[in-house]
Design a protein with these regions (language model features):
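Membrane-proximal alpha-helical signals and transmembrane carboxylates
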Residues: 2-228
Length: 228
């Protein structure tokens, strides 16, 4: 597991260095989010969970070091939740390496426009990460994520890329989602996933998608309902 995490960490650090935005010293002062989970509570507060890597790289060393951290923040808005998480982190949290935006069923039903606006208005957030609705308990997802060998965002990104030729898999990144909304009377879609506990180990499994109207979830398409 440590070997695989080190390999993933090397990929993340290489991509950061490759785009030329950070040097070794700067990387050691930043925590990078690899995925964001958007949720809402019973009081309509925004709850954010981010799966992060805190890397460490020395120009004189050949190996990459770092550790995984999962933060939770709550606020009236996403920005308030992010500020709360930054207070808990000794390093600044950076969102330029996010690979997946994940919405709980409740967040998707209540509407995702404010989250899309956050992504659209902050240059740290990219338009290439895939969007998903997660059907299940967030704590279960966090437990599976914490015990797994791979970062949630990277795992979902690789899972979609591996299944691009599978007509049963629904996928959309932020750019796809917004473009579809503009040309289809505010109707769009995104992928969905569940935790499959039929096997000996609980595993994340892509499972259909959701139909969005005016940025609110109006229907769910399970994998068995998708026409191949």
């Amino acid at each position: 597991m440590k070997r695989k995490l080190a390999s993933i960490l090397s990929i993340i650090i290489f991509s950061i260095m490759f785009i030329g935005c950070f040097n070794y010293r700067e990387i050691n002062k930043i925590t990078f989010a690899t995925s964001i989970i958007f949720d809402r509570d019973e009081y309509d507060n925004v709850i954010l969970y981010i799966d992060c890597v805190r890397p460490y790289r020395n120009a004189n060393e050949s190996s990459d070091k770092g550790r995984r951290i999962i933060f939770k923040g709550t606020g009236k808005t996403s920005l308030e939740a992010i500020r709360e998480m930054n207070v808990k982190s000794s390093n600044r949290i950076n969102f330029s390496q996010v690979r997946a935006y994940i919405f709980t069923e409740q967040a998707a039903r209540k509407g995702v426009k404010k989250y899309i606006d956050l992504i659209n208005n902050d240059q740290e957030f990219g338009f290439k990460p895939y969007m998903f609705t997660y059907f299940g308990d967030v704590n279960t997802l966090l437990d599976v994520t914490s015990s797994d060998e791979e970062y949630l965002g990277l795992y979902l990104d690789q899972l979609v890329e591996k299944n691009r030729s599978n007509a049963k898999v629904i996928s959309a990144n932020v750019n796809d989602y917004i473009t579809k909304s503009l040309v289809a009377n505010n109707i769009s879609y995104m992928g969905a996933f569940i935790i499959n506990d039929d096997a000996l180990d609980k595993k994340i499994e892509l499972n259909g998608g959701v139909i969005m109207k005016d940025n609110h979830m109006i229907d769910r398409l399970e994998q068995k309902d998708v026409v191949s």
